[in-house]
């Protein structure tokens, strides 16, 4: 699992198959939520923020964040609904992913193998590629550079690597 805030607007836009304009609107929405101290834990949190910004009460806030149109916000909401209908909502929430979960060993010092099953990849390739990118980015930012070691602490294999480069 990952919190929506941790996943970020760029990877979420990829998972939602948004175009550049819609991705930029999502970035503005994330920035507004951050400026208001709102933590986006799951998709309903993001939906609530977008719904507020497109409501009568939030129209001034919406105008103040760079002119996100109601139509663009509507596209993002529909994309969220589609992602949820494909089971994508199960990925977002708390507690968030912790890199340490992948770097565990048993009492004798042998590594523990962790598997991430994603089921039918063909039904949600954009989400799968975004999740893999999220995991790689999180590992890159949280693991220290150690140079050449006798044994690696982590070995990361993933199938369907071509998904990372589609629309790159």
What do these predicted regions represent?
Residues 1-168:
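P-loop NTPase motor domains
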């Amino acid at each position: 699992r990952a919190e929506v805030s941790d996943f970020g607007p760029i990877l979420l836009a990829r998972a939602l198959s948004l175009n550049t304009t819609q991705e930029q609107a999502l970035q503005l929405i994330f920035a507004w939520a951050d400026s208001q101290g709102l933590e986006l834990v799951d998709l309903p949190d993001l939906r609530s923020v977008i719904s507020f910004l497109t409501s009568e009460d939030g129209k001034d806030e919406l105008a103040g964040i760079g002119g996100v149109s109601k139509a663009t916000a509507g596209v993002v909401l529909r994309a969220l609904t589609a992602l949820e209908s494909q089971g994508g909502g199960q990925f977002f929430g708390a507690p968030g992913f912790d890199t340490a979960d992948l770097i565990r060993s048993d009492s004798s010092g042998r590594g523990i193998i962790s598997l991430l099953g994603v089921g039918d990849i063909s039904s949600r390739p954009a989400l799968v590629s975004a999740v893999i990118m999220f995991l790689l980015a999180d590992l890159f930012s949280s693991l220290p550079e150690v140079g050449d070691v006798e044994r690696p602490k982590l070995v990361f294999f993933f199938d369907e690597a071509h998904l990372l480069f589609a629309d790159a």
